[in-house]
Regions:
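N-terminal auxiliary segments of SAM/dcSAM-dependent transferases
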Residues: 1-42
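Class I SAM-dependent methyltransferase Rossmann-like catalytic core
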Residues: 46-70
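Conserved SAM/SAH-binding beta-strand->alpha-helix loop
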Residues: 113
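A short SAM/SAH-binding and catalytic strip from SAM-dependent methyltransferases
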Residues: 148-162
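Conserved class I S-adenosyl-L-methionine
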Residues: 79-89
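Conserved beta-strand signature within the Rossmann-like core of class I S-adenosyl-L-methionine
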Residues: 176-185
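Conserved SAM-binding loop of SAM-dependent methyltransferases across substrates and taxa
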Residues: 90-103
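C-terminal lobe and adjacent flexible extensions of AdoMet/dcAdoMet transferase-like proteins
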Residues: 240-244, 248-321
């Protein structure tokens, strides 16, 4: 394998080879059942025999993009040498970690699903990283499992609140530098992120992102903090979902906590910016609450910079009103 090939590209090739071994109608039936179960929040319902392959086809690309986006927030990626993936599934977060941290030496993946663990071995074998696998329920682990970065990606929603709090505390204990939490970008998903935020701030954690402060979250009621990645659908993805649109948007909420104090931006864009004739309008999360910023041409460089703003970007300029 060439040194230039990304971990994702290698994993995607392996997934395509697995999918090619099964008829499309059977995979489509499995994908539809998977989607129905997730919409109904029935994560543990009886599964189609091709559930694991359907998950790879339907969910792996989007959850990879989210994990890669979130892990890329961590500074000095060359200093990260170990990674713990709790509730690893097929190893999506671990593949993203391989593409994010160039000097990764060791990874530990823990999941209760033996078939997913077999798949993750295949998807991750493109690197010389030492791989450790453990099969078990993540909320009943004995530990310890120390690692520079501990990741829980789309995991908390499968546990009750008591088990969530206990696992978050364990994960924070094992994290040597950072703890990464990702949940669906829904009110329920963000609710889990918010509870983890409150729990670990009380333990002395520092927020790396997305929050630009340690104050209470200013988003209340029907508003919640979430972001989005747009990914291009591959041909097999479109065929399985029966759609023609060439892309999809994956909404997510996240939190990265640090063991060390970090420098925050002044603000973060929390809603898609609007570009109007002669004006740029965007909403910011700040230490003083949510602020709507309006920039015009008279704001010069700040106005030009605002034209390129995206949801989730940091903002440090005081220009505008």
């Amino acid at each position: 394998m060439s040194a230039e090939t990304s971990a994702f590209a290698y994993a995607n090739t392996q997934i395509l080879q697995m999918l090619d071994q099964h008829p499309l109608p059977e995979l489509k039936a499995a994908a539809e059942e998977l989607s129905q179960n997730y919409r109904a929040l029935e994560f543990h319902k009886s599964r189609h025999p091709l559930f694991h392959l359907a998950y790879l086809a339907v969910r792996f690309p989007a959850t990879f993009d989210v994990n890669h986006k979130v892990l890329s927030v961590i500074p000095n990626p060359q200093d990260i040498t170990s990674f713990l993936d709790l509730g690893a599934g097929p190893g999506t977060a671990s593949v993203a970690a391989q593409d994010t941290f160039s000097d990764l030496k060791e990874m530990t993946l823990i999941d209760s699903d033996g078939q997913f663990q077999k798949i993750s071995r295949t998807l991750l074998e493109s690197r010389k990283t030492k791989l450790n696998f453990e099969q078990g329920l993540i909320h009943r682990l004995k530990g310890p499992y120390p690692a520079d970065v501990v990741s829980m990606s789309y995991v908390l929603g499968e546990l009750d609140e008591g088990a969530q709090a206990a696992l978050i505390q364990e994960a924070w204990t094992w994290a040597q530098k950072y703890l990464s939490l990702i949940e669906p970008g829904t009110p329920r998903g963000y609710g889990r992120i918010l509870r983890a935020r409150e729990q670990l701030l009380a333990k002395g954690a520092y927020i790396l992102g997305p929050c630009p402060h340690h104050n209470g979250c200013p988003l209340t009621g029907n508003d919640w903090c979430h972001f989005s990645v747009r990914l291009q659908r591959q041909e097999y993805h479109r065929r399985l979902k029966g759609v023609s649109l060439g892309y999809e948007d994956e909404k997510y909420s996240y939190l990265i906590l640090s063991k060390e104090s970090v420098t925050h931006p002044k603000a973060r864009v929390i809603r898609p910016p609007r570009s109007l004739p002669g004006r740029q309008i965007f909403d910011l999360c700040t230490s003083n609450g949510v602020l709507r910023k309006t920039l015009t041409k008279k704001d010069g460089p700040a106005f030009k910079a605002a034209k390129h703003l995206r949801l989730g970007d940091a903002w440090d300029d005081d220009s505008g009103s």
